[in-house]
């Protein structure tokens, strides 16, 4: 656990296998995924204040695949980033099946406090956020101006860089939610004074996490 939390960007299963001298890649892989599942704390506080929300893809589109929101060959994600002045506060991420109104509204309700200001792009699925102050932004690219939703777009960029860098592009779509858990855990604790605090927090959450076996993890469906 210390090997994982002491590294700023984490490590891949192959890296953990080498560091610990494990004879089996499967053992390192299982250890990492158990810990990634423990990185989500039940009952964690929702985001609040001003929160930017946007959707993105992971998969074939990253390598020049087909484009367009309704292409289902890609893994769909939604990301929320809390504003902390001009900086980024806490974040949340989730895999989603589609960009329909019901799906996007459920993510917002599960992760953002009612009464918060939710900033989105012009996608119609975001309309009628009745429990929130909705700041819907549509940009005319010909007119230029400041980029829309800068915080959440930066978070999305950092996530993709992390998936391609630390994990060397090996993040399987089947387990992508576990990788999102780790990224959120690390990002939300990036200001911790010491790596020891991350270790303590993860150990605390791992003790209370539901058990996960190799067969449970590998029997998942995408």
Please state what every model-predicted region is:
Residues 1-222:
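Residue-level recognition of single "structural anchor" positions
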């Amino acid at each position: 656990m210390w090997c994982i939390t002491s590294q700023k960007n984490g490590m891949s299963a192959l890296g953990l296998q080498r560091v610990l001298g494990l004879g089996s890649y499967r053992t390192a892989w299982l250890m990492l995924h158990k810990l990634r599942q423990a990185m989500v704390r039940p009952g964690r506080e929702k985001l609040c204040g001003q929160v930017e929300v946007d959707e993105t893809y992971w998969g074939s589109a990253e390598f020049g695949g087909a484009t367009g929101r309704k292409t289902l060959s890609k893994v769909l994600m939604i990301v929320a980033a809390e504003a902390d002045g001009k900086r980024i506060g806490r974040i949340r991420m989730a895999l989603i099946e589609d960009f329909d109104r019901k799906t996007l509204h459920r993510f917002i309700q599960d992760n953002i406090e009612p009464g918060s200001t939710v900033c989105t792009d012009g996608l119609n699925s975001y309309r009628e956020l009745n429990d929130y102050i909705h700041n819907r932004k549509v940009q005319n690219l010909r007119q230029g101006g400041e980029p829309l939703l800068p915080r959440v777009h930066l978070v999305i960029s950092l996530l993709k860089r992390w998936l391609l860098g630390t994990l060397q592009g090996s993040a399987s779509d089947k387990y992508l939610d576990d990788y999102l858990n780790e990224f959120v855990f690390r990002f939300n604790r990036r200001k911790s004074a010491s790596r020891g605090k991350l270790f303590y927090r993860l150990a605390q959450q791992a003790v209370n996490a539901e058990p996960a076996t190799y067969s449970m993890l590998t029997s998942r469906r995408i």
